[in-house]
Amino acid sequence: MKLGVFLPTYLLPGGEREHADQIRRFAAGAEELGFESLFVTDHLLTATRFYRVSWLEPLTTLAYAAAVTTRPQLGTSILVLPTRQPVVLAKEVATIQRLSGGRFVLGAGVGWYEPEFEAVGGHRTERGRRTDEVLDATMELLTEADVTFEGRFYSFDGATVEPLGAVPPVWVAGGRQLAHAASPERPVMAPTVLRRICRWNGWIARPTAAPDQIDEDLREIDAELERGGTSRAERGFTVAHENFCWLSERAGRDAAVAEQRERMFAVVSDERPWEYIEAVYLTGTIEDVQRGVQARIDAGVEYLLLHTMTADLRQLKLFAKHVLEPFAGVAPQLNRV
C-alpha cells in the first residue's frame, strides 16, 4: 500500500501568521519521512454541514508545495470540477506540472455542496454533465494545440494552452457512502459515476464509505472494466481512499476516543454524530486504527490518503511510525487485483 497525507490547509482560527510556514514544514517533513504524496482538499465555500472550517485554494497551495519538495506526488482530493472553467484549469494544471516536474495527480469529482455551484452560476443538477465536459476539454487542451470545443456548458474556438504534453493521471471520486441522515448523498454507485470512474486512471473511494462499501463499489468497477474488455491491471488503474485520522497514544479506546473527539470536532461539524464518525473514519487506539487500515486494504485499497487534522509534525511522525512503516508494500488480496 502507498500512503499520502493531506497538507494542513484548514483555515483554523488564529493561524494566519504561521500558516505558510506550517505548510512548508509539513510538506518537507512528509517528504523526509517517506510519504508518497501530498494532497489537498477543495471547497470554494465553507461547507458548514460537514466542516467547521474552510481550506486554502488547492492548486495555488500545490504550486507552493512543489517549490519546497522534490519527490512526493502532489494531488487534489478532490477538485470540484463543476466550479472550474476548463481553459483556466488546463493552464493551472500545465503550470503545476511544469513547476513540479510532472508530479501532479488530478483527483476529480462532482462535489456536493449546493451553495458552491450557485456561487459560480451553476446548479447542483448540472454537476455530472459539467464534470464530464471539464475533464474532456481540459485533457484535450493539455495534449493538443488549436482546440475547438463545443459543449453544453463550455465552448471555445482555436485555443492553445501551453506548455503542452504534461497530462496528469486522473482519479475520479464517487461511489457509496454510509447510509445515514447526515450523509449528503444516497448510498449507491450511480451508473453515470461508475462509467466516469472507468474512463480514467483511478478511483478515490469516499471518506464516508465503510470498507464493505468500498469492496462492493470495486466489484462494480471491475465488472464495468471487464465489460469494456480491459482490467485494472491492464489500465494501470489506481484504487485510492481518503480518510480522516488523529492518532492517540493513550492507552484504552475510551481515552483515545476522548482525545480524537476534541481534535476531530475542531475540523468536522458535530452535525454528524460521533457514531457516524466512528463508522467511517479511523478512530480508537493505534491498534484499532491499524485494524481499520487493514480492513480497507482487504477491501482493495492500494493508496490511502490521510488527513492528519493538524499541522503538528508529531502527528506526522506518528503516522509514519504506526501506518506508513507497517503497511508500506502491503497489497490487497490477490483475487481483488
Label every model-predicted segment.
Residues 1-337:
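Active-site-adjacent structural elements that line small-molecule/cofactor binding pockets in enzymes
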